[in-house]
Amino acid sequence: MYEVQADYVRENIDSDALRQKYHADNVVYFFLFNTPYEHTPNPWSLGFLSSPDYDIEYVNLYIRFGGVFDAPPATYAHEILHAFGAPDLYYVDTGIPQEFVDYCSQTGCNDIMFTVNEGETISSEFTPLDAYYVGIGPRPAEADEWGLGPSEYDAN
């Protein structure tokens, strides 16, 4: 799906003109799909660390997923935060060790990058760790305690 979207954007949208017009470093394309409940993939984001177009990011959100429910507002927020560099905290990935994932599971972590609540309001928390990963806060002590990887903003 990524290549189809990336090709469409390259062929039809002048991303450089958008960056210049809005004095932006990056452009985020948010795709919203009106999907059925059956056979719908989970939402995903493809951003800076995983995209060959380092100044373009893609977010895909499927209105219905998981077989049973419509995507709640917290899902939108979670996916948008990916576009700014926040990693998922619910599985092991580069910079997120298993021990930290286990800790989040055992403590009932309410970080929006670990859990997305259902319902009309967002009750998940935007934490200092999230602020660090999206580039608006300092590296919190817990990142060093758990050996979490650097944010995209520290890595550049």
Positions of PLM-derived features:
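Active-site-proximal segment of zinc-dependent metalloprotease catalytic domains
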Residues: Y2-D93
